[in-house]
């Protein structure tokens, strides 16, 4: 009863922090054991004294203790299990957090699989509007006396005017514009998709897009528009040449916009699609595999098009010196591969109960005399067998390093490990793990069989235990088997331009299992002279269990090889082999499960699974290459624009983000900079280079169309009169710098030498500071007088900061508040500054009207394999590369 009181009080204690909760979970195990003892004592006292149970109430805390406190031993054990499970889950969460912190690019598996499957050809690039930087805008015209005229004039202005001030920032703006164009650059343009009706047309004609239609509408309604232009707009319509599948649409575009769109139209990525292309798109080994029956739909329209995937190989060599990046790529490939490896379901495996019963009979475990032999049956289940099968194939497909987990005293695990090391190349295992497993096999099975002393292996020895043992063992069959394992490596073969890691032919056809069995038989016949009889008997029975399944092991090896090679045909990136930062754990008990439970049912990937795996690989690979092209282009553009402050690391970060699978903040800096250096060495792709040259040639025109910045300022010691300008009225503006001494503002900021400006001004010589400056307008004459002189020159000379330079544009015209004050009193305002602003390009309808040509219609297919219907032969009849059934043991 005392226990109950204590328990009740403990439950009512306030939980001050999370640490107390953790301590409670850990202490619960001890408390539960105490519960057992107390309950037993309670039962005894109840039997002796009374059958009634008292309910003790703690008056002070008002806590009621329920009748059900007395629990059965079954309930207690259940509670104990729950506590232990909670503790185990908590430890897993802690390990998960540690993993997240230590592995730079670690992410949960489900999210990685979703990310890699969601990478698809970018259908968003199907344009519904033409690409435009400029739009025409109406501006008033001012007479010589500053009064506004009734007529207007059209100029080309920026659609989105976000130009910053400062030459460097302007160049950075152009880099961002370039990046935006690269993202928006269409793979193909079909003008018919974006064409809209021309409202002013006589016969329901169409123009190329909605913006062209709205411009035509505005010009048509403008009173200043000439009659001939109105008649022309009324006649604007598409011209169709159906026999050539061509259509021409009228468009109104700035010459620079026209150059971009014309380039996009002439350099589309779509190519004609026919049955031969689809046939060649299917991996050759799948086409030639007699287990798959493929049929193709022959009814492809002549207008069918496709975008060829960009499958260039190894341009960055991410396997070389990019440990965390490579780890993430192999992890995502592993997770993807696991999702496509066929499952060994329970109906394909031998019944676990029946098999364990048979093994028990073989081991003669009725007496259960030897503890070690009971371990042979531990952990054998169909789930572990399936997990092992998927892990082995997925790890080889993704070239993920595996680490082995085993107990040395479980001889059955070690004997299963001998099969594993025989069929899986050594490269696939973590070196330390491989050495530990080999050493356990040598010291537990091989050396004791021949009465040899234990091998004392020196850590760091270049030779593995099996390599040392091969030289010391005299028995031919065992030495021959060791020799095979020591030389079991992947063969690198280039198939269809892709580097494949292929298995040894002896493994593919399963003959190596006979070699393994010969070695095992030799070992079981040995006397184990230095070991007790029970030890010898345990090893022999373990070998007997495996050798009884010789036929199934041959079939399993052939099945493993076939599934690996069939799925490998769907891989498009070179299979580079490098040990990975993290490993996939493999329990040797699960290998035992696979060896003991494999049945005679053949499982091969379904055609739909293969096509899905192939499509995901193609999409990821193509996206990877396109993002490389973007990053290389941006790095080259940043260098050519002389963006010396641009952090190249940010470009590399954007590149990795666009690959979808990386957790960019966790990638170490050294790998970021190494990646930058690799990207710098690559050439720029042709389309991207041409687009950049178009921007480079027209930077001045784009800058000129902005209302946010001026191109410089002229500073004088004496006042200068305001001049008449058709666009603004009377202004302190100049359209030319001829006759002025010019100083570059960016150079001035970098050197900080203001002496030259001061000397020139003191000598009464005006000086022109050239650079992108904020274009501030102020039309109030009163504020103009207040800010005069002190605005520009005094501040920059005093503070030595050019970035504070904000020359004000003084506009005096009939729109300004004080225009009549100036006009009536013949006041001629002056200023010590003149803003240098280039004239935007006037809108000329005739020069802006362009005919754009594209195909009248075509259909772009992104999934070529949707045309292929596929089926498989009956799995029992499926044959391997040697024209024999994959699984012969029926």
From Swiss-Prot:
- The region called 5-fold hub is annotated at 1-88
Where is this protein found? Virion
Which keywords, in A-to-Z order, does the entry hold? Capsid protein, Inner capsid protein, Repeat, RNA-binding, T=2 icosahedral capsid protein, Ubl conjugation, Virion
**Positions marked as site (Interaction with the intermediate capsid protein VP6):** 232, 236, 849, 851
Where does this protein chiefly localize? virion
Keyword Protease in record: no
What are the boundaries of the region Disordered?
1-46
User: What are the GO MF terms of this UniProt record?
Assistant: RNA binding
Family (UniProt): Belongs to the rotavirus VP2 family.
The record's comment about this protein's domains reads: The N-terminus binds RNA. It is necessary for encapsidation of VP1 and VP3. The N-termini of 10 VP2 molecules form a cylindrical hub underneath each 5-fold axis of the inner capsid.
Subunit text: Homodecamer; each decamer is made up of two conformers of VP2, called VP2A and VP2B. Interacts with a VP1-VP3 complex. Interacts with the intermediate capsid protein VP6. Interacts with NSP5. Interacts (via N-terminus) with NSP2.
Could you tell me what this protein is called? Inner capsid protein VP2
Cite the source lineage. Viruses, Riboviria, Orthornavirae, Duplornaviricota, Resentoviricetes
């Amino acid at each position: 009863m005392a226990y109950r009181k204590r328990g009740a009080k403990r439950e009512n204690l306030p939980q001050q922090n999370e640490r107390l909760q953790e301590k409670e979970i850990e202490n619960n195990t001890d408390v539960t054991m105490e519960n057992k003892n107390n309950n037993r004592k309670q039962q005894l006292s109840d039997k002796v004294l009374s059958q009634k149970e008292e309910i003790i109430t703690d008056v002070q805390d008002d806590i009621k203790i329920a009748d059900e406190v007395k629990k059965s031993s079954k309930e207690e054990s259940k509670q104990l299990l729950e506590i232990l499970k909670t503790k185990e889950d908590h430890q897993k969460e802690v390990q998960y957090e540690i993993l997240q912190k230590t592995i730079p690019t670690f992410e949960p598996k489900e999210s990685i699989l979703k990310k890699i499957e969601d990478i698809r050809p970018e259908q968003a690039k199907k344009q519904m509007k033409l690409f435009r930087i400029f739009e025409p805008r109406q501006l008033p015209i001012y007479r010589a006396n500053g009064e506004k005229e009734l007529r207007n004039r059209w100029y080309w202005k920026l659609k989105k005017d976000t130009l910053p001030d400062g030459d460097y920032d302007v160049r950075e703006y152009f880099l961002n514009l370039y990046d935006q164009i690269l993202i928006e650059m269409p793979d193909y343009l079909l003008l018919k998709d974006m064409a809209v009706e021309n409202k002013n047309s006589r016969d329901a004609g169409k123009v190329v897009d909605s913006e062209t239609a709205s411009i035509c509408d505005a010009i048509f309604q403008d009173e200043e528009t000439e009659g001939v232009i109105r008649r022309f707009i009324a006649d604007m319509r598409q011209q169709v040449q159906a026999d050539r599948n061509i259509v021409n649409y009228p468009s109104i575009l700035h010459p620079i916009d026209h150059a971009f769109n014309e380039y996009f139209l002439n350099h589309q990525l779509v190519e004609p699609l026919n049955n031969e292309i689809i046939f060649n798109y299917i991996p050759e080994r799948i086409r030639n595999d007699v287990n798959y029956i493929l049929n193709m739909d022959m009814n492809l329209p002549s207008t069918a098009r496709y975008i060829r995937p960009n499958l260039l190989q190894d341009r960055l060599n991410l396997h070389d010196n990019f440990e965390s990046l490579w780890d993430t790529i192999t992890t995502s490939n592993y997770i993807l591969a696991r999702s496509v490896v066929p499952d060994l379901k329970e109906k394909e495996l031998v019944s676990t109960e029946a098999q364990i019963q048979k093994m028990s009979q073989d081991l003669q475990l009725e007496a259960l005399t030897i503890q070690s032999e009971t371990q042979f049956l531990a952990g054998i289940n169909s789930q572990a067998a399936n997990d092992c099968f998927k892990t082995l194939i997925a790890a080889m497909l993704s070239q993920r390093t595996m680490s082995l987990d085993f107990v040395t005293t479980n001889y059955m695990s070690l004997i299963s490990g001998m099969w594993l090391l025989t069929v899986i190349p050594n490269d696939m295992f973590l070196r330390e793990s491989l050495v530990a497993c080999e050493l356990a096999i040598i010291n537990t099975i091989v050396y004791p069989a021949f009465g040899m002393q234990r091998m004392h292996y020196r850590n760091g020895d270049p030779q593995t235990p099996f390599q040392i043992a091969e030289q010391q063992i005299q028995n031919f069959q065992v030495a021959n088997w060791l020799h095979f394992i020591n030389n079991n490596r992947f063969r690198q073969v280039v198939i269809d331009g892709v580097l494949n890691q292929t298995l040894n032919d002896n493994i593919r056809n399963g003959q190596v299992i006979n070699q393994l069995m010969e070695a095992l038989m030799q070992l079981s016949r040995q006397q184990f002279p230095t070991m007790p009889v029970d030890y010898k008997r345990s090893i022999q029975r373990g070998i007997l269990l495996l050798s009884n399944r010789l036929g199934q092991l041959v079939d399993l090896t052939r099945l493993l090889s076939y599934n690996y090679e069939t799925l490998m045909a769907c891989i498009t990136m070179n299979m580079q082999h490098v040990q990975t930062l993290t490993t996939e754990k493999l329990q040797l008990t699960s290998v035992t499960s696979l060896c003991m439970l494999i049945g005679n049912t053949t499982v091969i990937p379904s055609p739909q699974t293969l096509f899905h795996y192939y499509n995901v690989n193609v999409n990821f690979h193509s996206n990877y290459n396109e993002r490389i092209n973007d990053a290389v282009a941006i790095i080259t553009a940043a260098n050519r624009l002389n963006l010396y402050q641009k952090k190249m690391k940010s470009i590399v970060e954007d590149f990795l983000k666009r690959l979808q699978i990386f957790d960019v903040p966790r990638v170490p800096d050294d790998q970021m900079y190494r990646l930058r250096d690799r990207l710098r060495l690559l050439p720029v792709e042709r389309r991207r280079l041409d687009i950049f040259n178009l921007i480079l040639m027209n930077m001045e025109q784009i800058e000129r169309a902005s209302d946010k910045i001026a191109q410089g300022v002229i500073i004088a010691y004496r006042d200068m009169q305001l001049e008449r300008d058709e666009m603004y009225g009377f202004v302190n503006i100049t359209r030319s710098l001829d006759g002025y001494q010019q100083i570059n503002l960016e150079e001035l900021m970098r050197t900080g030498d203001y002496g030259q400006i001061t000397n020139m001004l003191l000598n009464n010589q005006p000086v022109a500071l050239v650079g992108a400056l904020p274009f501030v307008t102020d039309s109030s004459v009163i504020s103009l007088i207040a800010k005069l002189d002190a605005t520009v020159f005094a501040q920059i000379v005093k503070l030595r900061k050019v970035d504070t330079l904000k020359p004000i544009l003084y506009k005096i015209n009939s729109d300004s508040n004080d225009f009549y004050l100036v006009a009536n009193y013949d006041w001629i305002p002056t200023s010590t500054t003149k803003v240098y602003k280039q004239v935007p390009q006037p809108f000329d309808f005739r020069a802006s009207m362009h005919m754009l040509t594209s195909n009248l219609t075509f259909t772009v297919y992104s999934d070529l394999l949707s045309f292929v219907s596929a089926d498989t032969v009956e799995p029992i009849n499926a044959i391997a590369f040697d024209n024999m059934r994959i699984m012969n043991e029926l």
